[in-house]
Amino acid sequence: MTELDSLWEAIQNSFRKSKGDTTYKNLIAPAKPLDFANGRLRIQLPSQYHRDFWEQLTDQVVEIVYQRTGQEIRPDYVLATDPTPLAQTPPRPQSTFKEETPLNPEYTFQTFIEGRSNMMAYASAFAASESPGDQYNPLLIYGGVGLGKTHLMQAIANNMKFHNPSVRIKYVTSENFMNDFVNSIKSGTQEEFRREYRDLDALLVDDIQFFASKGETQTEFFNTFNVLYDNKKQIVLTSDKDPREIPNLTERLVSRFMWGVPVEITSPALETRIAILKSKAEEEHLDVPNDVLNFVAQRINTNVRELEGALMRIRVFSELHQQPITLKLATEALQGMVANTETTVTIDLIQKRVATYYNINQSDITGKKRTKNIVVPRQIAMYLSRELTDNSLPKIGKEFGGKDHTTVLHAIDKIERQVQEDARLQGDLVKLKNDLQA
């Protein structure tokens, strides 16, 4: 085996262990070593997309080779269509703004676990990536933290790049957009800013809720949105809540956001949580028994991020104690986390506690009766559902017998006003909150 073959085998083996199977198959395996001489390792890649990905791995490649040979090398990435080393290619014209925030190549549709809680969002995102600028434009994905919004957004970009590596995509957070806009005003480069954000095939903006109260930024984004939409360019947005619930967001911007397809992601159901854990375990090459997967999924019912965090905690605990992963070990590893998640407040729990407190049935809370002894507890339950959970107004309305989100908003406003002058109501709310959060 030559030195080049030996080094390449070490690099491949390292990434086969550290990257998911999908990433390895699609982005690592297609690379080919060309030669290794004078401290330079030339690696041939099939597309610019692959080269962008490997450039993010440079530090890891250098470390792997150093551990193997004691040499500090420099990787050069070349395209199969143009074997000239990257270092010798003419430099691109420098721009004040980044073309995009680097995408995570592991955020693909193949690695996203689909379930009832995200089925509509998944289908809409995939359709938008296959036919950008068409029926699903703009695409707005909203929901709580750690439920997969960013994963789906980047999966759209990765799929578009897979089909067309030269596609112009800009993926930013709303804060990135605002900072770039402010800097363009300070530096007098607004026209360049507009070219950067409008001469695109797709614009993806994460966390649009941070546009709230930013008047000039909202105006600039409104104009950018219109240019892209009129030119049939794909727009994808994410938010932690329904835009209609975001305070200090202009009506015309909310209207634009709701033009296309707004889809909500909610907390995953039990079977989806198990599938997520199983997929993560396979990706990390962990041997996790089914009873452990079920144990974790039943007790961590909030979001994907916490599920995966729990699994990694079990892994560290297993390695630290040099013991295989068992139900007993998992219980010990998650002792603190499980205690916290078992008290998660849900709409159903709120309805039950409020019904018990006011000596009525839960079916009265979700029903249509309009007598005062039922209407007030129902409004209190809606108010607490908004305050103690991450659910949107439409979701809350659905859980209260299919009420419209405006009915929920009215109930919340009424309780907020009444609690200012009703000491008894204040006391009731304090007792209910303490009971729910105990």
From Swiss-Prot:
TM stretches of this protein: none
Region (Domain I, interacts with DnaA modulators): 1-71
Location of region: Disordered: 81-100
Binding residues annotated for ATP, in chain numbering: 146, 148-150
GO MF terms, alphabetically ordered: ATP binding; ATP hydrolysis activity; DNA replication origin binding; lipid binding
Keywords (A to Z) from UniProt: ATP-binding, Cytoplasm, DNA replication, DNA-binding, Lipid-binding, Nucleotide-binding
Annotated spans, Domain IV, binds dsDNA: 319-438
GO biological process, one term: DNA replication initiation
Domain II, as annotated region: 71-101
Cellular component GO terms held in the UniProt record: cytoplasm; plasma membrane
Family annotation (InterPro entries): AAA+_ATPase, Chromosome_initiator_DnaA, Chromosome_initiator_DnaA-like, Chromosome_initiator_DnaA_CS, DnaA_C, DnaA_dom, DnaA_N_dom, DnaA_N_sf
UniProt-listed SUPFAM superfamilies: P-loop containing nucleoside triphosphate hydrolases, TrpR-like
Domain of life: Bacteria
Role this protein plays: Plays an essential role in the initiation and regulation of chromosomal replication. ATP-DnaA binds to the origin of replication (oriC) to initiate formation of the DNA replication initiation complex once per cell cycle. Binds the DnaA box (a 9 base pair repeat at the origin) and separates the double-stranded (ds)DNA. Forms a right-handed helical filament on oriC DNA; dsDNA binds to the exterior of the filament while single-stranded (ss)DNA is stabiized in the filament's interior.
Domain-related comment: Domain I is involved in oligomerization and binding regulators, domain II is flexibile and of varying length in different bacteria, domain III forms the AAA+ region, while domain IV binds dsDNA.
Quaternary organization: Oligomerizes as a right-handed, spiral filament on DNA at oriC.
Family label: Belongs to the DnaA family.
Name under which the protein is recorded: Chromosomal replication initiator protein DnaA
Species this protein is from: Limosilactobacillus fermentum (strain NBRC 3956 / LMG 18251) (Lactobacillus fermentum)
